[in-house]
Amino acid sequence: LSSAASDVYKRQDLQHPWADGTSSLYFDRVRFAYFDLRILGREGAEKDYSAEELAKVAELDKTITEAEKDDLIDTIIVKTQGFVNGNIKEGDKNPVNIFKKLLALYKGIDRDMLRENMRYFLAAVMPVCEEYGVNMCVHPDDPPFQVLGLPRIVTNEADIAWFLNAVDNPHNGLTFCAGSLSAGEHNDTRELAKKFAKRTHFVHLRSTAAMPGGNFIESSHL
């Protein structure tokens, strides 16, 4: 189970090369901001970025090519949404408009409403999980901070503790994604692993390296 906000798993380079011949995912915050502000044109988006980031977006606008813009659209919308949800496909006309309609589905939904929806769902399915011995595991938001104005509800220690306590059942557990959690400088991944070990039902062992400016890159393959 992913939180609803994980609908926006946003990366700008899905094939960032490493010296050993492998590749991984790279998040460039300024290019993501450019997509949000100049391509998507989301209302109020400028409030989500610092003055320094807005200035960098303005500079990028002077040099970015149409091919690079198309690549951002393809990476952030077509490839990512096609993989995660299957609701956008290669060859779809005007994927930006399709994506805007998907975002509009969350209009008026705040953090508290999304939390309550999660609590309601988990409470409803726990009796069935108990009956059949099924463990549910919630995947952290990826990345673990707000994007595109959407509420994020599984980003840190407090969030994880909240959903585990909201439906305090051993079948309600965590997917411990080291990559997602370590992308947030606010998270101590080792301590989180220790604290929530008993309620961790599935593990994604891949780390990320956080860099200045909000960028991060997933490590090479284990």
State each model region's role:
Residues 65, 106-121, 151-155, 173, ...:
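Active-site glycine- and acidic-residue-rich loops that bind
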Residues 115, 147-161, 181-222:
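Gly/Pro-rich active-site loop or hairpin
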Residues 126-133, 163-171, 190-200:
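Acidic (Asp/Glu)-rich catalytic clusters
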Residues 15-114:
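Extended, charge-rich helix/loop segments that form flexible
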Residues 96-147, 152:
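Loop-centered beta-sheet repeat module
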Residues 141-143, 177-179, 208:
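An acidic- and aromatic-residue-enriched active-site/binding cleft used to recognize and process polar
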Residues 1-12:
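Single conserved hydrophobic/aromatic residue that forms the stacking wall/gate
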Residues 136-138, 172-176, 201-205:
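Hydrophobic faces of well-ordered beta-strands that scaffold small-molecule active sites
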